[in-house]
Amino acid sequence: MKLSIILGAGLAAAAIMLAQPLPPDDASQKKIIADATAKALAYVNDLPDFVCRQVTRRNEDPKGTNQWKTMDTVNEQLTLLNRKEEYRTLSVNGKKASGENRPGGLLRSSDFANYLSWIFDPKAKAEISWSQWDALRGHRVHVLGFRVKPENSQFVISKGKGQPVTAGIFGVVSVDSESGSILKVGIIATDVPASFPVQGSAIEANYEFAKIGDHYFVVPLKADLHSKEGKMLVWTEVEYHDYRKPGAETASK
């Protein structure tokens, strides 16, 4: 009985190892990184005109005990025309809004392009390396690790009217193995001065294929932004829904 269990466990482990592809060779890894860089730098130009909904939830945990309270929920319509964003506020905390005044401090879809620039812009001088294979929302992905020094970074953290700081960053990028498209970036701030009020800042941005008109495009899917000030934790969730061509009816309201 014990022997059969051991053999079964061994066969299962062998099956997992066989299912996991070997790491790409050095030349292939360099090409994966080069192709991901090209995709990142072309991201804005590859976006079509579209309309979608952006939903933002801002949450706080004053004591850092994982007891979150949603401070507000903002539902907006986002229109992208000729690479220019236009927001119309639909509701705030479930109450219909006039649509004219956008609440301050909200993420913009263009920030998804900024995150890619922070890593792949040549001025960032990022150290990028292939890390491992992984799976993400049904895609087999390459996971790349990266690091950008503060002197080359575009990640600026501000607090109130005080002097902002430019932080270094490190993290991971998930790249679709079939298309080379970037599907997720995870960014963590480093080298923040000990005297600065915000001592923790991290971003996770997800991208996905969406059908807009007759074609599929890589567009923002969701983002989570985290920060820490003393015991206070702040978590902003952003989701995108109902992508369509301008002038087309939404599939869900």
Q: What spans do the regions from the language model cover?
A:
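Hydrophobic h-region of N-terminal signal peptides that target proteins for export
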Residues: 10-20
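Bacterial N-terminal signal peptides that target proteins for export
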Residues: 1-10
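Structured extracytoplasmic
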Residues: 20-169, 177-184, 188-253
